[in-house]
């Protein structure tokens, strides 16, 4: 599946997603609802079933409904599925300035699992096994379990965990 995809690919049984063309999924855990109407100050957003978290405000919202969201020019409405483990890297001037030594994981309340791939991003050394594959999982108890499924590359020096209640 493509990284950016229509909601219907994730929620094919939900008839509300069948003709939706102004919201999309980023992977299976993030929903983006960009403002597409000029001059709009509010945006109607459909959230499929399940629990969602507003990425910006961290407000929990029940899915299976339409909501009205303020739509300032500088903020795209983004919603995170409960239980998501969202990977991030520290802010850089531009990508590729240095090797990534720190991984930041935002862990959203609920049960979830995430596989993370790490290599140098520069060559084909991964074909000879020069990569790491991690599996992170958690349940509602707030504990994050890390398993290294494949080790063939220097591990992160630091993995910072940020719990999002």
Predicted feature locations:
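Catalytic core of carbohydrate-active enzymes
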Residues: 1-164
């Amino acid at each position: 599946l493509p990284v950016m995809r229509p909601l219907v690919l994730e929620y094919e049984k939900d008839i509300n997603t069948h003709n939706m063309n102004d919201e999309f999924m980023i992977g299976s855990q993030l929903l983006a609802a960009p403002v597409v109407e000029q001059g709009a100050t509010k945006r109607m957003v459909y959230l499929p079933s399940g629990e969602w978290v507003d990425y910006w405000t961290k407000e929990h919202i029940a899915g299976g409904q339409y909501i009205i969201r303020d739509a300032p020019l500088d903020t795209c409405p983004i919603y995170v599925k409960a239980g998501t483990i969202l990977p991030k890297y520290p802010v850089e001037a531009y990508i590729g300035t240095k090797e990534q030594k720190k991984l930041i994981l935002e862990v959203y309340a609920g049960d979830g699992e995430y596989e993370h791939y790490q290599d140098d991003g520069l060559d084909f050394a991964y074909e000879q096994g020069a990569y790491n594959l991690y599996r992170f999982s958690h349940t509602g108890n707030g504990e994050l379990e890390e398993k290294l499924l494949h080790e063939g590359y220097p591990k992160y020096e630091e993995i910072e965990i940020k719990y999002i209640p």
